[in-house]
Structures are given as structure tokens and as C-alpha cells.
Amino acid sequence: MKEHVLNQKKAVVEEIKGHINDAKSMVIVDYRGLDVSEATELREKFRNENVLFKVYKNTMMNFAFKELGFEGFLDYLSGPNAVAFSMDDPIAAARIAKEFAADHENLEIKAGYLGDKFLDVEGVKKIASIPSREVLLTKMLGSFKAPVSKFVYLADAIAKSKAEGSEETESNETTETVEE
């Protein structure tokens, strides 16, 4: 093999390893059967969530996975594969792949990686069902807000009942004064 070709292949393997190391998670999908418009739609969905979606030769991914000790993926490297690297939200790649596969039967989720854990298809689907960070933060803030809102409502109700009680006392005193 010519040296420049070998260097190009080594560069691709290094690129894959770099993406794996930089990503918070990764999902491998079989995109066989997607037409151009569907593939474009999928790429756009990934891009909007800062998920890098790349197609590499299986042999290049094989070398990268072996060098990083990701032997669990080697069994999934057959057919046309693409890899989605989630750079920000660790759930984004899995969530987008799962949602897209639900509407497009030609996209097949094969495996994934989150943190230091290999995920089979079921594992990818499970993490895909976890709400996004923003949704979880909103729910958490809502749970903090609810007791405070109830306390404010209760304090307001007590203040109103005391105000009504003092008005009744004043009106009773006025009535007694008029009667005398």
C-alpha cells in the first residue's frame, strides 16, 4: 500500500478516535434504505442538537474501536453504518435516532456508548427515553417552586382571614356603640 494512502487511513482512524474521546455519547446506526431527503432530514436533526453524524468505512471504525478498547462494537460493523457523536447533551444522539427510526423503518439503531458503558439496542432506546437536561431542570425547578407557591397561598389566606376577622370585630364594636 502506498505511504500516502496509509497516512490518509491513519488520519481517518485518528479522527474517529478524536470524535469518540470528545463526545459525551455515540450511537451506531444502519442507514441502508434511507433516500437522500430522509438522510438530509436526519443530518439536520443531528446538526441542530450539536450531534456530529458521520459515515466511515467499517474497517476504519474497526481499527479505531480496537485501539480504544471498544471491542463491543466490532460485532456491529457490517453493512452501511454511520456514527452519531453527541458533543453536548449525552442523550441527544440516542433520542434523535430513536425518534427518527420510529418514523423511518429504514434506520436501524445498532449500538451505542455512554460515558464508559457499551449499550446494545435496548440500552440505547432506554437512554433515549430520558428527558433532556432542560426538561429535567424545568421539572426540578417546578418541584422547588410548588411548595413555595403553596406557602405563599396559605400565608395570603391566613392574612385575608385575619383581615376579615378584624373587620367583623370592628363592625361588632360599631354596632354595640350605636345601640347604646
Curated annotation (Swiss-Prot):
This is Large ribosomal subunit protein uL10. GO terms for cellular component: large ribosomal subunit. One of its GO terms (molecular function) is structural constituent of ribosome. Pfam families: Ribosomal_L10. Belongs to the universal ribosomal protein uL10 family. It comes from Finegoldia magna (strain ATCC 29328 / DSM 20472 / WAL 2508) (Peptostreptococcus magnus). Residues 166-180 have a biased composition (Acidic residues). Residues 161-180 are annotated as: Disordered. GO terms for biological process: translation. The gene is rplJ. Forms part of the ribosomal stalk, playing a central role in the interaction of the ribosome with GTP-bound translation factors. Keywords: Ribonucleoprotein, Ribosomal protein, RNA-binding, rRNA-binding. InterPro entries: Ribosomal_uL10, Ribosomal_uL10-like_sf, Ribosomal_uL10_bac, Ribosomal_uL10_bac_type, Ribosomal_uL10_CS_bac. Part of the ribosomal stalk of the 50S ribosomal subunit. The N-terminus interacts with L11 and the large rRNA to form the base of the stalk. The C-terminus forms an elongated spine to which L12 dimers bind in a sequential fashion forming a multimeric L10(L12)X complex.
